Amino acid sequence: MILTVTLNPSIDISYCLENFNMDTVNRVTDVSKTPGGKGLNVTRVLSQLGDNVVATGLLGGYFGDFIRSGLDALEIRHQFLSIGGETRHCIAVLHEGQQTEILEKGPHITKDEADAFLNHLKLIFDAATIITVSGSLPKGLPSDYYARLISLANHFNKKVVLDCSGEALRSVLKSSAKPTVIKPNLEELTQLIGKPISYSLDELKSTLQQDIFRGIDWVIVSLGAKGAFAKHGNHYYQVTIPKIEVINPVGSGDATVAGIASALEHQLDDTNLLKRANVLGMLNAQETLTGHINLTYYQELISQIQVKEV
């Protein structure tokens, strides 16, 4: 079973407008409200793949109940911890081929709630083999909270796929608690290293050899339309993907995480892990909905992905 962790979930609200006018009334005819947050995008894709997945994290208030109901409607199992604060909204205004986002920070998590969630995980870890940890830390949680969570998972011999950025990721990399996989994009990798990084294979390879990545089994760097570059142990891979028509790229990284987790769960080899991860990211980008894939095109696309050891 794959357990997905979302500590700062949201209700994702999408408003579609032909024109977005400032300082006046904008009337919306097309509105969608869905359970959101990076980890829940991962969850939906895994569910659509047919993998055994359970969602966990922190939910509070009326809007937390809305997310539970939304997952129930999708027949996705969940075991969230209830908190005192209210779960947040994230609003996307789609207009004139552009997307304007308004993101709430979310509830403040108390120390008691933070400790309670780690105890909550101990109770549900047994059935899981793979843990995905995605997204930002809500207010109140220290920057080393993911490191503490990963340390707990390692104690239970669980594989962890981590998808976060900034100080939360930096804290993990500085700690002794290492995840199985991290999936930075090129911008996030640049922030970690503190200097610009090009698409050069030699530069990418030398970057991933730095001490900061020591102890991490897989480092998979997303390069957008250029595919990916990956390190697994002492092996390095260049992933080339075909050109596709992109409808909505939001959530493609989350779909990629779902592919990584699914491949680990099914014990795929390196080549097929990288192919599954990348094809799911591409399938998400071809859909209007975030965290959604159409498996009709799976075989056609995956056959065009090339993985080369370099």
Curated annotation (Swiss-Prot):
EC number(s) recorded for this UniProt protein: 2.7.1.144
Signal as UniProt keyword: no
InterPro entries registered for this protein in UniProt: Carboh/pur_kinase_PfkB_CS (IPR002173), LacC (IPR005926), PfkB_dom (IPR011611), Ribokinase-like (IPR029056), Tagatose/fructose_Pkinase (IPR017583)
CDD domains: FruK_PfkB_like
GO MF entries: ATP binding; phosphofructokinase activity; tagatose-6-phosphate kinase activity
Record carries keyword Heme: no
Pathway stated in the Swiss-Prot or TrEMBL entry: Carbohydrate metabolism; D-tagatose 6-phosphate degradation; D-glyceraldehyde 3-phosphate and glycerone phosphate from D-tagatose 6-phosphate: step 1/2
Keywords: ATP-binding, Kinase, Lactose metabolism, Nucleotide-binding, Transferase
Pfam family, one: PfkB
Gene3D superfamilies: 3.40.1190.20
One GO biological process term: D-tagatose 6-phosphate catabolic process
GO terms for cellular component: cytosol
Enzyme class: transferase
Catalytic activity, as annotated: D-tagatofuranose 6-phosphate + ATP = D-tagatofuranose 1,6-bisphosphate + ADP + H(+)
NCBIfam families from the UniProt entry: 1-PFK (TIGR03168), lacC (TIGR01231), PRK13508.1 (NF010033)
UniProt family annotation: Belongs to the carbohydrate kinase PfkB family. LacC subfamily.
PANTHER family tied to this protein: 1-PHOSPHOFRUCTOKINASE, 1-PHOSPHOFRUCTOKINASE-RELATED
Name the UniProt record assigns to this protein: Tagatose-6-phosphate kinase
Organism annotation: Streptococcus agalactiae serotype Ia (strain ATCC 27591 / A909 / CDC SS700)
Gene: lacC
